[in-house]
Amino acid sequence: MNRPGDPTVEELMARIAALQAENHQLTERVVKLEEELALARLHRFAPKSEKHVDRLFNEAEQLADKEDAGDEDDDLVELPDTGFPPTDKPQGKKRGRKPLPEHLPRERVEYDLTEDQKACPCCRHQMHRMGEAVTEQLHIEMKAKVLQNVRFKYACRHCDRTGINTPVVLAPMPAQPLPGSIATASTLAFALVHKYVDGTPLYRLAQAFEQAGVPVSRGALGHWVIGSSERHLSRIYDALKLRLRSQPLIHGDETTVQVLKEKDKEATSTSYMWAYRSGEHSDDPIVLLDYQPGRGQVYPQTFLGDYRGILMSDGYTAWRTLNSATHIGCIAHSRRRFVDALKARKKGGGPPQQALRFFEQLYRIERQARDKKPDAGETQADCIHRLRQQHSLPVLNALKSWLDDIAPKVVPDTKLGDAVSYTLNQWDYLTRYTSDGMMPIDNNLLERDIRIFATGRKSWLFSDTVDGARASAVVYSLMLTCRACGIEPLAYLRHVLSELPQRATSADITDLLPCNFAKAAAARSNIDG
């Protein structure tokens, strides 16, 4: 019998239910925080490369039965056998020093015995030279010189004697990239490559000039960068942008950049470099960065306009607002979420391991499809499409069934829950690549280009002004496009910074685009050969 004031059974049951709900919420929060702590430790102390991820995956696969016995073993399923042959293990790279390139000029430095050393130590007769021992070393030296541009003046003595006033005629010289500047096209190219290819901040580049006995201020270097971009290189950028819009396939992504002096924004705020790239097998490889202050949908819409081709991107909704494009998703983004879920686990194995097994099989099929010789009358794209339909689709169907099965069982607000939710929500986009052999499976091609920008960002940290950020976008775009075309950035910049000042703003510059520069260089090489 309850005493007066004691809670009723219903009230006690309600309290128990509330405590149980609170305990469940706290348990989920603890799981989430433990995952975040585990990932933070990995990001701080462990390698961040995919090789480290593969080590985690392999260890988890080997130890799954021992360490993860229990209910989760029910989630492990056999992968479908599509009849695809196993992948041969790639041969390791040969070790050892590579020979010095044959195209480098050779300079002989000879060492001979003195006359008294040429006498035989045994009989003291004169020894004869029987050969030579040659070793090669790489010698690099930096040289700076001053070009004196001497322009001869001419006047008419006959007119002078007759009292006729005639002007002095001065010999012309080619237009310079930055009129009034001490920098030649070669010097500008040198500075741009050091900053945007080697990732050298301007203050360190100024120090390097100082150490070489050529004092150049950081402000002058900044003027060289922005001036080269605004006056000349932006013309190449605009031409590449027009060509990119006509590509059948475009990769899209974005990454952060900080600009200190930007109107209506704090110095610590985040701006963005939007990245665009043509397909891997395009005849005109193009990589463009576009600086913008935000991450809204208006930026890709403005850049690409009514683009009607294939657009590869991650799950960010701004890309999907381009209604005219055919959108495909990035399998690698989904895979990385399961990688994070595997890293966050206290023990290996479980559902993250199972998911990675599916992805591994999908990528194995891609590698073999890419290397397979097409059948008679079949294009490479047709061959890839056929193999995807035959082998990739069964794996994807099995993955979808498995995800549908485990989705109700996982805690939503965890790394595994995020991975499962993302993959299911993006499923139509992630699997669309199987419908066309021209479509890539992921966005890794562009992400490798962005990684070069991100590496440089670690050195120079931020852009001081908006003009500097836009100049960086232009120069990085040309450097990355040169890389995609397989041409040397320094040689390319020397050429275009010498040639563009000679051409009117409305002149045709098609021959100066990186892809055409590469074709011309290849043609010259064939002629010389």
Q: Where do the language-model regions lie?
A:
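Short, flexible loop/hinge motifs at secondary-structure junctions
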Residues: 1-178, 182, 251-252, 313, ...
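Catalytic center-proximal scaffold of phosphoryl-transfer enzymes
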Residues: 2, 88, 117-119, 128, ...
